[in-house]
A protein has these predicted regions:
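N-terminal Rossmann-like FAD-binding beta1-loop-alpha1 element of flavoenzymes
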Residues: 3-32
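Core beta-strand elements of the Rossmann-like FAD/NAD(P) dinucleotide-binding domain
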Residues: 3-5, 151-161
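Conserved structural-core and active-site-/substrate-pathway-adjacent residues in large, well-folded domains
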Residues: 9, 20, 56, 111-115, ...
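Residue-level detector of alpha-helix initiation sites
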Residues: 13-14, 39, 167
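Active-site-adjacent segment of FAD-dependent monooxygenases/related oxidoreductases
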Residues: 44, 49-120, 209, 219-221
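Conserved FAD-binding catalytic core of PHBH/FMO-like flavoproteins
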Residues: 117, 161, 165-236
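A conserved short coil-to-beta-strand element within the FAD-binding core of flavoproteins
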Residues: 128-143
Length: 236
């Protein structure tokens, strides 16, 4: 049976967007839906590595991250007196066998906005402010039931494959009743992203301070941003 779309991607964050663009680049007929109108405007991920840049290079989109990212000098584990325990140095200009720097730090709202623009210019069909309602198996394909969140209109279409890129609380996973593996890590962290107003002398390396009283992490995010992460203790 001929379906309306070859692949439907649920969730258009960076993972869903890049999946859609890569499929479209291979002449796959793609529908992407997301329940939100706009990208999430707070930073979450901050790091992209050489393999990620290599994937973007296939789409000629590596500039999105290169123009919005900063290289770092290394990454270290420090004790509570800031003495180095272990880590790696990253020499300036060092390239891996993939032809890119091993890691760069970016500001996600910048890069996500540019990826969204690329998606909307592509041959992918896109429905925003549209929520997945149900996935109904029909032989060798699925009927995707959706609802427009602005006017309540329900729209259904057929697809050969479905990609669930809708995050930790994935509706695709819940509908399909897929198991979620729990790695039993239940610690909460306070993540503080700071936009600097003036030049600073903060180090250009990432560090985790292994203080037994409170573990914390410092990330020299893409200028003018910096990130600190603090583990929350019991009762906090």
């Amino acid at each position: 049976m001929k379906t309306d779309y070859d692949v439907t991607v649920i969730g258009l964050g960076p993972a869903g967007t890049l999946t859609s663009l890569l499929l479209s680049d291979s002449s796959v007929n793609v529908m992407g839906i997301d329940k939100e109108k706009d990208i999430y405007n707070l930073p979450r991920a901050v790091t992209i590595d050489d393999e990620g840049l290599r994937i973007l290079q296939r789409l000629n989109l590596e500039h999105i991250y290169l123009n919005n990212a900063t290289a770092i000098e290394g990454a270290y584990f420090l004790d509570d007196k800031l003495n180095k325990l272990s880590g790696i140095d990253i020499p300036s200009g060092h390239l891996t066998s993939n032809g890119w720097m091993p890691t760069m730090l970016f500001h996600q709202p910048y890069t996500d906005a540019l990826l969204r623009e690329e998606l909307l210019r592509s041959t992918c069909s896109v429905k925003l402010e549209t929520e997945l309602v149900d996935l109904i198996p029909k032989g060798n394909h699925y009927i995707v039931k959706t609802q427009n969140l602005t006017n309540g209109e329900e729209i259904s279409f057929s697809t050969q494959y479905v990609v669930g890129a809708d995050g930790a609380s994935s509706k695709v996973r819940n509908i399909m009743k897929f198991d979620q593996e729990d790695l039993d890590y239940d610690k909460n962290w306070l993540v503080v992203d700071v936009k600097l107003n003036v030049e600073n002398t903060l180090p250009r390396f990432a560090a985790q301070i292994c203080d037994p009283k409170r573990i914390c992490t410092y990330i020299p995010s893409h200028l003018p941003f910096r990130r600190w992460e603090f583990i929350l203790l019991e009762g906090e």
